[in-house]
Design a protein with these regions (language model features):
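Tandem repeat scaffolds
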Residues: 27-163
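Bacterial N-terminal signal peptides
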Residues: 11-23
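A general, composition-driven signal for non-globular sequence regions
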Residues: 2-5, 21, 87, 102
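Bacterial N-terminal signal peptides that target proteins for export
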Residues: 2-14
Length: 163
């Protein structure tokens, strides 16, 4: 009887622990579908993925590698893309309102017609980045490397450029 009771207790305990882990809001895995608040920090994704129209506001994409990935027409408001590698990625008409892109590498990225209102680009690498017709109202570009970037038709009202 003692052995049976002990085994039942262990099974019950295991079920309880497993259910707590599943309902605790644990960090998302790198294979999880894009959604609001997902945490992909430190994940590596294959080159050339198409994540157009992805809805990932409030998500953590920091310390991530997304080389040549398409995020066109996506929603990434309040997302964190800090210290990520987004070389040659496309953000055409993407909504990045108040996103944190601090220290990220966005060389040759395309932000044409993107909403970059109040975006934090502090210390980011923006070499040959395309901001044509984008909205950079109150964006913070302090200390960013902005070599040969294109700002034709962009709204730069109240943007911060201090080194």
């Amino acid at each position: 009887m003692k052995k049976k009771l002990g085994t039942s207790f262990i099974k019950l305990f295991a079920i309880l622990v497993l259910s707590l882990l599943l309902t605790s809001g644990a960090k998302a895995g790198c294979d999880d579908a894009p959604t609001d608040g997902v945490d992909y920090s430190n994940c590596q994704f294959s080159e050339g993925q198409d994540l157009s129209r992805a809805y990932i506001p409030n998500s953590n994409l920091s310390f991530i590698s997304f080389i040549k990935v398409t995020f066109d027409k996506g929603v990434m408001m309040n997302a964190t893309l800090a210290n990520g590698n987004f070389v040659e990625s496309s953000f055409i008409r993407t909504n990045l309102y108040e996103a944190n892109l601090e220290g990220g590498i966005f060389e040759k990225a395309n932000f044409s017609s993107a909403n970059l209102t109040r975006v934090n680009f502090k210390g980011a690498s923006l070499i040959e980045t395309n901001f044509t017709n984008s909205n950079l109202f109150e964006a913070d570009l302090t200390g960013a490397n902005i070599l040969n970037a294109t700002f034709e038709g962009a709204n730069l009202n109240n943007a911060v450029w201090i080194d």
